[in-house]
Amino acid sequence: MGVSKVAIAVAVMLMVVVINHPAVVEGLTCGQVTGKLGGCLGYLKGGGYPSPACCGGVKGLNSLAKTPADRKQACACLKTLAGSVKGINYGAASALPGKCGIRIPYPISPSTDCSRVN
């Protein structure tokens, strides 16, 4: 009986340790996406040519989105962000990667199916 009490105590202590240590979350967050593209808002609303800061953010985001899961997450975040900002010029948004000298494997559009992004 003493052994089972010790085993239970050890199991409880292990559960407490596991519960109190948050899991490491890997992957891209919407906060990172928003942070990288914050310098692009003027371009996305007014067109013209994106600033060097904007293109730096676009390139940085492209570098962060290393896996298909990251790219799907970035796509979903961009769609959410675009829906929350009034006055976005979607033609300018679609042209943004090319104007910054990068290629992405999916169109930037409110109708993009993020589940198909690889």
UniProtKB/Swiss-Prot annotation:
> Under the GO molecular function aspect, what terms does this record hold?
lipid binding
Cell membrane as a keyword? no
Q: List the keywords (alphabetical).
A: Allergen, Disulfide bond, Lipid-binding, Signal, Transport
- Note the CDD domains from the entry: nsLTP1 (cd01960)
Pfam family name, one: Tryp_alpha_amyl
PTM per Swiss-Prot/TrEMBL? Disulfide bonds.
Q: Which GO terms describe its biological process?
A: lipid transport
Q: Which residues cross the membrane?
A: none
**What are the temperature characteristics of this protein's activity?**
Stable up to 84 degrees Celsius.
Q: Does the keyword Transport apply?
A: yes
Q: List the disulfide bonds.
A: C30-C75, C40-C54, C55-C100, C77-C114
Q: Which SUPFAM superfamilies match?
A: Bifunctional inhibitor/lipid-transfer protein/seed storage 2S albumin
Kindly report the pH dependence of this protein's activity.
Stable at pH 3.
Q: Which residues form the signal peptide?
A: 1-27
Extra facts:
Found in celery but not in celeriac. Highly resistant to pepsin and other proteinases.
- UniProt-listed PANTHER family: NON-SPECIFIC LIPID-TRANSFER PROTEIN 2-RELATED (PTHR33076)
Biological role stated in the UniProt entry: Plant non-specific lipid-transfer proteins transfer phospholipids as well as galactolipids across membranes. May play a role in wax or cutin deposition in the cell walls of expanding epidermal cells and certain secretory tissues.
Q: Would you identify the family this protein belongs to, as annotated? A: Belongs to the plant LTP family.
Q: What is this protein called?
A: Non-specific lipid-transfer protein
Please tell me the species this chain comes from.
Answer: Apium graveolens
